[in-house]
From Swiss-Prot:
The lineage of its organism: Eukaryota, Metazoa, Chordata, Craniata, Vertebrata. This is Ubiquitin carboxyl-terminal hydrolase 17-like protein 19. Residues 80-375 form the USP domain. GO terms for biological process: protein deubiquitination; proteolysis; regulation of apoptotic process; regulation of protein stability. Residues 496-505 have a biased composition (Polar residues). Belongs to the peptidase C19 family. USP17 subfamily. CDD domains: Peptidase_C19E (cd02661). InterPro entries: HABP4_PAIRBP1-bd, Papain-like_cys_pep_sf, Peptidase_C19, Peptidase_C19_UCH, USP_CS, USP_dom. It is found in: Nucleus; Endoplasmic reticulum.
Amino acid sequence: MEEDSLYLGGEWQFNHFSKLTSSRPDAAFAEIQRTSLPEKSPLSCETRVDLCDDLAPVARQLAPREKLPLSSRRPAAVGAGLQNMGNTCYVNASLQCLTYTPPLANYMLSREHSQTCHRHKGCMLCTMQAHITRALHNPGHVIQPSQALAAGFHRGKQEDAHEFLMFTVDAMKKACLPGHKQVDHHSKDTTLIHQIFGGYWRSQIKCLHCHGISDTFDPYLDIALDIQAAQSVQQALEQLVKPEELNGENAYHCGVCLQRAPASKTLTLHTSAKVLILVLKRFSDVTGNKIAKNVQYPECLDMQPYMSQTNTGPLVYVLYAVLVHAGWSCHNGHYFSYVKAQEGQWYKMDDAEVTASSITSVLSQQAYVLFYIQKSEWERHSESVSRGREPRALGAEDTDRRATQGELKRDHPCLQAPELDEHLVERATQESTLDHWKFLQEQNKTKPEFNVRKVEGTLPPDVLVIHQSKYKCGMKNHHPEQQSSLLKLSSTTPTHQESMNTGTLASLRGRARRSKGKNKHSKRALLVCQ
């Protein structure tokens, strides 16, 4: 049977029935419709994964795979802590997870983007390049994140860390497009950011009357997991890909037999990302209540059972970062993260404090966002570091010794690390705002007909989250381990967190705003380091 390929209004159709066209020509997805195929059909199950290379034909490859840095440029040791500028722990926790993402960090340290970027302002890639370079090249220090990293997002109160994370990833993806503003949506999925974090879902509907199959493909940058009925990440993934029966009022209108008939609908991962961002849905959109249950997650995760093809061998990912929310609900708490340095040692990154940790402590957290990288990618980056660096990896016997050597000396945190290059600071004013980003997210939300499981948002936009210092008693159970601090502020100098987390909150733009509720009466002056 001859295969017809048709491009319709931003949509690529692969159709075995030349007289049939999609009823949704304006949607940004690729669809395949076919009847029962013989075993040696060109589109049989054995070759379906290969089709993903053709389901999104591109007019222009924005980031050729051969241009991605292959060797690691990252220092082996852990980098700097981040100063809290007043309810910005959600920013710091997210930035640390991105900083220790090997493919992203290697690209940033190559400085390839800033050498070719022609934008004068609003480039998130330039801003992140400057931040990651400073953070990784200043171990033992505390640096102040650039105001431009949260410009347009931070509003003087604590926001949701996952929203900020994806806001930043989306801004970096858009920064890959200057000069290519007219490219089609398939070309946009060839950007550096999509090659690192992105993949494709496949939603397959099989008509139980004629056995015709319709495949819909949609890109993703993160994966949201419903944990209400799951005790582990693996269980949540199993629920996500569990087939759904469409019958009765929900019967499927088949595009092959043109009848309304019962059908089965299955969501699977069609192509895998180099880096997986798994979001555990801990917060209710309606009440803001937190699901404070322990959800088990492994150090090594095999994603093969959740792929479109399950007979191609293991697809193993290794954990390298965990973003944690500590507290009772979305209305209070504190964000911090755990990251795995290139040397293989885990560290707890809690604003300015950088503390050596163990995998046992890492796996016992009430995780909010999990970061996994393909094992082959991690090993490749680790091997290149071990060949190119002088000091050996930090072993368990070294951890305690180095952690008890006392406080590391440092000057004022704002003056310790090298300043940003002027031309990068000039570019660092972000054009997007939080409200505009949320509007675009609603506009680009996955089509209802694609979803097998509804993925709700994380936090209501008007939620006020109180910072750690006000609710220490509510978080004591989240810090069971007694770890040796590698990086502390001087005991004689009050920390910025202590002076900024109560009373009036300061935005990164330096404008004091009132907090809500019982803090309304407070008008303490705040010191914001410029």
